[in-house]
C-alpha cells in the first residue's frame, strides 16, 4: 500500500466491525480505532452510562466528534458505531477521508451475536429483534449509500472476512 489510506468499517451491531477491524489493521500494518472505545476513553465511562445520562442525542454528539477527529488521521482502520451513519456529517467525513467498507449481516446473526451483550443500550428491551429490524430499515440504505465495498460477514471468521476485504480493495 503506497499511500496510507483509511479504511472505515460501517454496518449494524453484531456485524463484526471491531473484531474484523483489529484483524484488518494487523494484516495491513495500520492503526486500529473503535469509535465506541474512543468515546469511553474520552468520557471515562461506558456507552451505557453515556446513554443513561446524556441520552442517545448526547451519545451521537460525542460520536460525531470522535469520528470527525479520528477520520482526520492517516493510515487507520476505524470501526464505527452502527448508528453513526444516521449523521449526514459523519457520512460525508467517512466518504471523503477513506475507503468505506459495509459489513453486511442478517438479523438472525445480529440477534445471535448480541443477545448476551448488556453493553448495547438500544437492545435492552423485550424484543431486540424488532429493534434490529427497525434499525436495519433506517440504516441499511445509508450503509449502502456510502459503501465503496460490501462484504457479507455471516458464517465466516473475522480473519476470512479481513482477507476478503483486502482482496476486494486490491491491497
UniProtKB/Swiss-Prot annotation:
It is found in: Cytoplasm. Substrate binds at residues 36, 60, 82, 139. Its EC number is 2.7.1.71. It catalyses: shikimate + ATP = 3-phosphoshikimate + ADP + H(+). The keyword Ion transport does not apply. Pathway: Metabolic intermediate biosynthesis; chorismate biosynthesis; chorismate from D-erythrose 4-phosphate and phosphoenolpyruvate: step 5/7. One of its GO terms (biological process) is chorismate biosynthetic process. Its main location: cytoplasm. Its cofactor is Mg(2+). Mg(2+) binds at residue 18. Keywords: Amino-acid biosynthesis, Aromatic amino acid biosynthesis, ATP-binding, Cytoplasm, Kinase, Magnesium, Metal-binding, Nucleotide-binding, Transferase. ATP binds at residues 14-19, 120, 156. It comes from the Bacteria. Gene3D superfamilies: P-loop containing nucleotide triphosphate hydrolases. One of its GO terms (molecular function) is shikimate kinase activity. Binds 1 Mg(2+) ion per subunit. The keyword Glycoprotein does not apply. One of its GO terms (cellular component) is cytosol. Belongs to the shikimate kinase family. Monomer. Catalyzes the specific phosphorylation of the 3-hydroxyl group of shikimic acid using ATP as a cosubstrate. This is Shikimate kinase. It comes from Shewanella sp. (strain MR-4). The gene is aroK.
Amino acid at each position: 500500500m503506497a499511500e496510507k489510506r483509511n479504511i472505515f468499517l460501517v454496518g449494524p451491531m453484531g456485524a463484526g466491525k471491531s473484531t474484523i477491524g483489529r484483524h484488518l489493521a494487523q494484516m495491513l500494518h495500520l492503526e486500529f480505532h473503535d469509535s465506541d472505545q474512543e468515546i469511553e476513553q474520552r468520557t471515562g465511562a461506558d456507552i451505557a452510562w453515556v446513554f443513561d445520562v446524556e441520552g442517545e442525542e448526547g451519545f451521537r454528539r460525542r460520536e460525531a466528534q470522535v469520528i470527525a477527529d479520528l477520520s482526520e488521521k492517516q493510515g487507520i482502520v476505524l470501526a464505527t458505531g452502527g448508528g453513526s451513519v444516521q449523521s449526514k456529517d459523519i457520512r460525508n467525513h467517512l466518504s471523503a477521508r477513506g475507503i468505506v467498507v459495509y459489513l453486511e449481516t442478517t438479523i438472525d446473526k445480529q440477534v445471535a451475536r448480541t443477545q448476551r451483550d448488556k453493553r448495547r443500550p438500544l437492545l435492552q428491551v423485550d424484543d431486540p429483534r424488532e429493534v434490529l429490524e427497525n434499525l436495519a430499515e433506517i440504516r441499511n440504505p445509508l450503509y449502502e449509500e456510502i459503501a465503496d465495498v460490501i462484504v457479507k460477514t455471516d458464517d465466516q471468521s473475522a480473519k476470512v472476512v479481513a482477507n476478503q476485504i483486502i482482496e476486494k480493495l486490491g491491497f
